[in-house]
């Protein structure tokens, strides 16, 4: 009985709901939401909703996701729903057993994806949330979950999510899969991928835009080891939070044998990483130089 269970039933999934009125958030379940009375407004038609999804051996109240939630709320009067599927992510298992549970956590990603699709449909039906105002941001296994949520939502024949942001999507047991078994550019109208590690993540292009931070691996300030790999993998979340928090734009240059310097960038061929990426005309793969310390800015204040 020592093997990690990493069991997940949908009833165990909870979430932290945060708004400008309640920035610290409250832990809730879908049952409590269905009974009503939690959202004090019944009409959320003008509210932006962001689903945030953690990765393997993590949880919704991990400081990196709390920081991103704060940054999102400072920038927009939105509602952040940080999904907590820690039981299924092996977070509660014995330290030494956590990693053995990874394949089970991978299986659980589909359950969580379906949960999010159902949840978003409920928000639209019961609270008048507009599909155009929904965005999913997932890290690691959470990015794969966001992709599965996008696929599940499309089964309702009600359209597609406008945007999914995959922060260093998990590579192991996904990277050689075809589109139906991993996050894919068809999961939303615009799929933005940030690559920061090539062992825990993948260098494979997956989205409408793929940003390769520092070539997509060995992030500055992280070291060459398993710890360094974890550090690089987590950097994706930190980079994105800084892109939300600061007007500083991390500029992506189209990938080529010798990418042009950021200083030569214009709006038409380069793209800023972040919530406004889809406003730029260019899609494809981009190289993003980064600094080793927050806000990781690469552009000396240049705006494009």
Swiss-Prot record:
It holds the Pfam family Lipase. GO terms for biological process: lipid catabolic process. Expressed by the venom gland. Its main location: secreted. It comes from Vespa velutina (Asian yellow-legged hornet). It catalyses: a 1,2-diacyl-sn-glycero-3-phosphocholine + H2O = a 2-acyl-sn-glycero-3-phosphocholine + a fatty acid + H(+). GO terms for cellular component: extracellular space. InterPro entries: AB_hydrolase_fold, Allerg_PlipaseA1, Lipase, Lipase_N, TAG_lipase. Its EC number is 3.1.1.32. Catalyzes the hydrolysis of phosphatidylcholine with phospholipase A1 activity. May act as an allergen and induce hemolytic activity. The keyword Secreted applies. The active site is at residues 140, 168, 233. Glycans are attached at residue 61. This is Phospholipase A1. Disulfide bonds join 6-90, 179-184, 222-231, 248-272, 249-297, 265-270. It is an enzyme of class 3 (hydrolase). GO terms for molecular function: phospholipase A1 activity. It is found in: Secreted. The keyword Disulfide bond applies. It comes from the Eukaryota. Keywords: Disulfide bond, Glycoprotein, Hydrolase, Secreted. Belongs to the AB hydrolase superfamily. Lipase family.
